[in-house]
Structure formats: C-alpha cells, structure tokens
Amino acid sequence: MKIALITVNTDNFDDVMPIPKQSVDFDFHCFTENNLPKFEMSKRLLSKYPKLMTHYLLPDYDIYVWIDGSIEITSEFFIEEIIKDLRDVKMAKHPERQTIGDEFNFVLDQMHVDNPYLLERYTIENIVRESLFINDGNLPLYACGIFARRNSPEVNRAFEQIWGQCQIFGNFDQPLFSLIEKLRLARFNSSS
C-alpha cells in the first residue's frame, strides 16, 4: 500500500515542521508555489487543490494523508493510527463546535465584528450562499486540518464535488465535507 503525506505552504505562510520517522512507509509531498499547477485563481484557492484534488497530482498512491502546513506531527505512529480502520475518509470531529450550523454562525459573527483573518479569506455573501446551498445546519462539523482518504473513484468524485463548490462559494471547504457524507458520496469515520 502506497501512502502519501501531503501539505501545502505558499508564500512561506507556515513553518513546515520535519516529519518524524513513521512506523509505516510513506512519501512526503509539500506543495508550494514552485510545484503547484499554474491555474488562474487566488493563492488561497490554489492551495486547496492538493488537499482536494490529490488524485490528479499524485495518482499512484492508495491513501492520502493531509495535514495543514501549521500542524506538527510528534508521534511515530501518526500515519499508522490515522489510516487504521479507514473506510473512505477519516477526520476528527471539530473540537469546539458540533455542527456546520454552529460553524456558519461562528464565522458570520466573527466577520460582523471585523475578524481580519476571516475577512481576508471569505465574503459574508459567499458564506451565506454556501449555508443556503447545504441547507442542513445540523450536519456534524469536522476538523479538516488533518485527515486520511482513499484514492478510489468514488472518493475522488466526492472530493471533486468539494473542489467544484469551493470554486463557486470561495474556499470555505469545511462544511462541504459534511455534505458529501450526508449525500453518501463517501463513507466517513472519525479519528480522535
């Protein structure tokens, strides 16, 4: 089984930490503006491409493990644990908010009080449009900074759905993972 550990770091936004030796074999891929495709889109959206469309960039792997650029792996069993009992997609539940409705409300509340981090990434209009599109605030909220997924036609199509919606609504992908689970486009299980 071939495993790819993937992250993105454009404009040296994060300090990508060294990956400790793991208990399973893997290849590490860090995408930057130097090795990302040259698409006409914002850097923020372009940085989502390896996260969501990995199967086009690295088609010869069986499993992809995603980590945000700011995440530091400290355990030698990290990859072994996250791929253990993997169905299609494995993510942790969000540690602070339970549902995507909670997340939409949190983001909108923060944008209304001029949170600069959110205002430079999203628009209120697109957040509202995405919320109306999903139309189910009770879906579980996942923490999308770390996940594992299979490279299979079904899962790839599900991630292509997320990519397509990110292009329509901006780059707020977090609630879209819950939507593909609801639509049964991919089978999820949670990690801790």
Predicted regions and their residues:
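N-terminal anchoring/stem segment of glycosyltransferases
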Residues: M1-Y49, M53, L57-I63, E154, ...
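Short, surface-exposed beta-edge/turn micro-motifs
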Residues: K2, F26, V89, A143-G145
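A general structural signal for short secondary-structure junctions and capping/turn motifs
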Residues: I19-K21, H55-L57, I82-D85, D136-L139
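Core catalytic alpha/beta fold that binds nucleotide/phospho-ligands
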Residues: C30-K38, R44-M53, T74-D85, V113-I134
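Conserved beta-strand termini and adjacent loop/short-helix elements that scaffold enzyme active sites
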Residues: F31-E33, H94-P95, S191
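Short beta-strand-to-loop acidic/aromatic patch adjacent to the donor-nucleotide binding site
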Residues: D62-E72
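Conserved donor-nucleotide/metal-binding helix-loop-beta segment in metal-dependent transferases, i.e.
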Residues: I73-V113
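Catalytic core and acceptor-binding pocket of nucleotide-sugar-dependent glycosyltransferases
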Residues: N115-S192
